[in-house]
Design a protein with these regions (language model features):
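Active-site-proximal N-terminal segment of extracellular/periplasmic enzymes that hydrolyze or transfer
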Residues: 1-40
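Structural motif
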Residues: 8, 112-114, 251-252, 389-393, ...
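Active-site metal-binding loops of divalent metal-dependent hydrolases
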Residues: 13-14, 118-120, 291, 440-441
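His/Asp/Glu-rich, glycine-adjacent segments
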Residues: 41, 51-54, 58-116, 123-142, ...
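Active-site His/acidic residue clusters
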Residues: 95-96, 386-419
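Metal-dependent active-site segment of extracytoplasmic phospho-/sulfohydrolases and closely related
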Residues: 412-451
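Conserved, well-ordered active-site substructure
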Residues: 443-467
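Single conserved hydrophobic/aromatic residue that forms the stacking wall/gate
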Residues: 471-481
């Protein structure tokens, strides 16, 4: 007997904004979504700040959005949790951090601090990095090296120079810290197994290989002069003595797991082979600020995960219902790991489908990404009648939005419009209901206030939520209107 599905479509990065200038969502031709929004019950939802467990005014992100949706409640996030620990003083007595620093003193080794250097608050926060540097000074460490990964996505694309200048000033004030490596997140924070990128970051960190520039601020400026903004800065070595060596302590200050896993595994997993390790594997005292992966060996965790109970996937499973999670690579972790409360757990009756994301340098080069392939696979499984619930993510509005290329983002929105219609129609044919929403905004703002500079970050704008019972696509002429 065929099941009647309830399909949840999460349009990643699809925010609602009144202003139309630089608004790829408002200006895209999207006859399907326009009709769905006009003819079905719906509302706007807040996807930022306190409503999703973040500090007031903090933009939402994919991890936070999927965690809250999957939990069915406000889940307070790691950003405010760590910030509160700093304010309360508990941060400075954290057992994992203390142990790593005491190990340095006992063995005469160096402390390496890695992290995304920005105040974007999505993967990390510069104030958390500064707090750890203060702690290292207080505990009497003499050799501290910071490996700064530049952002350019959750903050303006050329803001990294100012963050590096702030870090350099902090190092000079403390007197015991130096900037070792500067790298764009494109290399050091890949999450799609693009090991050629990760190799460059690893070689800079461990071998000191890469362009050398002793002035960190000038290193970033040289990249700008070459037309390369923060996200894509090729790993630069600023201090030859700052290479990571055996028995050193490493603290990775990123609190969001997905983009911290690959470079961490390169450093801690003796069985890892996807990146060449010319020095071979060597032991480290490695601290993950949060739990990046329960299978990660040879690490300690500073802020362990708080387990969520009775979340959506768990509840559906307990009812004896079947569920499907489907997305392309860039958002697969979000409909699985994050939707399940940040736990690597597959519930009974839960199936997962991963569609590979296209192998392109940046997604403005292929704004449709793998949305049509995701749709094909989803429709096939809807029509199989095997699932009671389907959780689906379309990555385009977020991933293309992050490139800052307006025209590509507009095309991304139009692709999502086409694909949403196919999924809704398939669900309707099976007698099911489709819920359409988003996790946060992004493509709704592609330009800074000057109307020229690309805006690459998320937004704090609301997102849609609609319940669709029956739907058929408009005629082809509506697409050309």
């Amino acid at each position: 007997m065929n099941k009647t599905p309830t399909t949840l479509i999460i349009m990643d990065g699809f925010g609602l904004r009144k202003e139309t200038a630089g608004n790829a969502i408002a200006n895209a031709k999207k006859p399907n979504l326009d009709r769905i929004f006009a003819s079905n019950p719906g509302c706007k939802l807040s996807a930022s700040g306190l409503d999703v467990g973040l500090p007031a005014g903090q933009m939402g992100n994919s991890e936070v959005g999927h965690t809250n949706i999957g939990a069915g409640r406000v889940v307070f996030q790691d950003l405010p949790r760590i910030s509160k620990a700093i304010q309360d003083g508990d941060f400075f007595t954290n057992e994992a951090y203390v142990s790593a620093m005491d190990d340095c003193k006992a063995k005469g080794t160096a402390l390496h601090v890695m992290g995304l250097l920005s105040d974007g608050g999505v993967h990390s926060h510069i104030e958390h990095i500064f707090a750890l540097l203060d702690m290292a000074k207080q505990r009497g460490l003499s050799r501290v090296y910071i490996h700064a990964f530049l952002d350019g996505r959750d903050v303006p694309p050329s803001s990294g120079k100012d963050f590096v200048a702030r870090l350099q000033a902090k190092c000079e004030a403390l007197g015991n810290a130096k900037i070792g490596v500067i790298s764009g997140r494109y290399y050091a924070m890949d999450r799609d197994k693009r090991w050629d990128r990760v190799q460059k970051a690893y070689d800079a960190l461990v071998l000191g290989e890469g362009p050398f520039e002793p002035d960190p601020v000038n290193a970033v400026q040289k990249s700008y002069d070459a037309g390369v903004t923060d996200e894509f800065v090729v790993p630069v070595v600023c201090c030859k003595e700052a290479v990571i060596g055996g028995e050193d302590s490493v603290v990775f200050m990123n609190f969001r797991p997905d983009r911290a896993r690959e470079i961490t595994r390169c450093l801690v997993d003796p069985d890892f082979t996807d990146v060449e390790r010319k020095k071979g594997f060597f032991p480290l005292h490695y601290v993950c600020t949060t739990e990046y992966d329960v299978t990660m060996p040879n690490v300690t965790v500073a802020f362990p995960h708080h387990k969520l109970t009775n979340i959506f996937g768990e509840y559906i499973s307990k009812l004896g219902l079947t569920q499907l999670r489907i997305a392309e690579t860039e958002k697969y972790a979000h409909v699985t790991f994050f939707f399940n409360g940040g736990v690597e757990q597959v519930f009974p009756g839960e199936d997962r489908v991963l569609i590979p994301s296209p192998k392109v340098p940046t997604y403005d080069l292929k704004p449709d990404m793998s949305a049509r392939e995701v749709t094909d696979a989803c429709v096939e499984r809807i029509e199989s009648g095997s699932y009671d619930v389907i959780i689906l993510n379309f990555a385009n509005c977020d991933m293309v939005g992050h490139t800052g290329v307006y025209e590509a983002a507009r095309l991304a929105v139009e692709t999502v419009d086409e694909c949403v219609a196919r999924v809704v129609e398939a669900t309707s044919r099976m007698g099911g209901i489709t819920l359409i929403t988003a996790d946060h905004g992004n493509a709704d703002r592609m330009l800074e206030d000057d109307g020229v500079t690309p805006y690459t970050a998320h937004t704090t704008n609301p997102v849609p939520f609609y319940i669709c019972l029956l739907y058929t696509s408009p005629s082809p002429r509506d697409y050309a209107a």
